[in-house]
Amino acid sequence: IAPLVSTADIAVCHLEAPIAPPGQEAMVEPQRISSAASITNALAFAGFDRCSTASNHSVDRGAAGVDATVAAFEAAGMGQSGVARTEAERLPALMTVNGVKVAHLAYSYGFDGTPLPAGEPWRANIIDPASIIADARAERALGAEVVVVSLHWGASMASNPTADQQRVAEAVTASGDVNLI
């Protein structure tokens, strides 16, 4: 896919699984998954610029998995949105694409019952229209001209949006601060 992906002005992917912490193996268990750090190098090689990392599996490996995920993207020279090592890192850096400053934000519907690390609600972004709008406004205050939001949501095996998805999308786009979901 590299010839196709690398021609895009900006190429964004989604990584469903967090990266396994150093010294731990990638895993696939019922309800808990993680990937090897080498996947970020493969995504960079394919031409992706950044990935959304907010998913129902974002905190499957706890804070160590979040830290490993951010570090793996940094090592691959890629950006990511959706998880953070620190509260200050929660809002991603702006990208400049053909002279336009672009923000990419990412959120998940939840974490399948896995709690966020105690006292660290900023570790992974959860879908909340007011928070999304506030984050988009913060990115605009930093100079973003375009704000793109990736939402990890939906009902399994459903081809139509739920009423809640429609409500969230309408609220977020009506704000005027988000250009694209």
Predicted regions and their residues:
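Acidic, metal/ion-coordinating pockets
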Residues: I1-I181
